[in-house]
Amino acid sequence: MFSIQQPLLVFSDLDGTLLDSHSYDWQPAAPWLSRLHEANVPVILCSSKTSAEMLYLQKMLGLQGLPLIAENGAVIQLAEQWQNIDGFPRIISGISHSEICQVLNTLREKEHFKFTTFDDVDDATIAEWTGLSRSQAALTQLHEASVTLIWRDSDEHMAQFIARLNELGLQFMQGARFWHVLDASAGKDQAANWIIATYQQLSGRRPTTLGLGDGPNDAPLLEVMDYAVIVKGLNREGVHLHDEDPARVWRTQREGPEGWREGLDHFFSAR
């Protein structure tokens, strides 16, 4: 049993979880966001999005100043009050975006894998793919430590592609709609554990953690949480955890921010 009155951290994915996958609406979650804010519970956004995108969304959601996890854990944006931490304002794990681009271009040219990265197109095309405005779409291209792409080849070739990436110290991660390439050393779980440890060091007590996500790339995050909400999502693969004890994990009946609200209701309203 736990409550929002005890030391608590909430980690949340964005698209398909806190935000509607199509409209990007978050209003169904607004009452809980306000309640968590009033209780001084940090809501830490955790996504495949770039830090530039997430800082914009963080401000829109009233969460500015808190830490966040970008690019599937390859980038940690530090909290405003953590200015004494080495690397402030951001910690980047693994090789850079430009280095990953070089690897992908070589694989495409020499081994003929078929894919389109966000670097291959302009913001108008990304806006068409995502439904974002062009100004918001431009923020999706500001990667620092990963590459987002659309796979346009066979499943057989994908297996070969993943094997080649792994040989080169990279990983291929499936999001709600796109695929992401990042350093094998990075991950939402490692980033979350680092943030949890930092809060513990600052307060002297390990906070209880609750994570919410809807896609396969959220599984590593949810695995390291004390409690997890798997929001009903669009991805056919879904989310599967090693420990799905009903006392720890809740699968929602609703999608997006309504599912987010349902998950918070489940764990807190009856407590």
Swiss-Prot record:
Keywords per UniProt: Cytoplasm, Hydrolase, Magnesium, Metal-binding
Catalytic function, reaction form: 2-O-(alpha-D-mannosyl)-3-phosphoglycerate + H2O = (2R)-2-O-(alpha-D-mannosyl)-glycerate + phosphate
CDD domains recorded: HAD_Pase
Chain positions recorded as Mg(2+) binding sites: 13, 15, 214
Principal EC category: hydrolase
GO CC annotation terms, alphabetical: cytosol
EC numbers for this chain: 3.1.3.70
Cofactor: Mg(2+)
Domain of life: Bacteria
Presence of keyword Metal-binding: yes
GO molecular function, one term: mannosyl-3-phosphoglycerate phosphatase activity
Gene Ontology terms describing biological process: mannosylglycerate biosynthetic process
Record keyword Hydrolase present: yes
UniProt subcellular location: Cytoplasm
Pfam families hit by this protein: Hydrolase_3 (PF08282)
Catalytic residues, chain numbering: 13 (nucleophile)
InterPro entries associated with the record: HAD-like_sf, HAD-SF-IIB-MPGP, HAD-SF_hydro_IIB, HAD_sf, MPG_Pase
UniProt xrefs under PANTHER family: HAD SUPERFAMILY HYDROLASE-LIKE, TYPE 3 (PTHR10000:SF8), PHOSPHOSERINE PHOSPHATASE (PTHR10000)
Name by which UniProt lists this protein: Mannosyl-3-phosphoglycerate phosphatase
Organism: Escherichia coli O127:H6 (strain E2348/69 / EPEC)
Origin organism lineage: Bacteria, Pseudomonadati, Pseudomonadota, Gammaproteobacteria, Enterobacterales
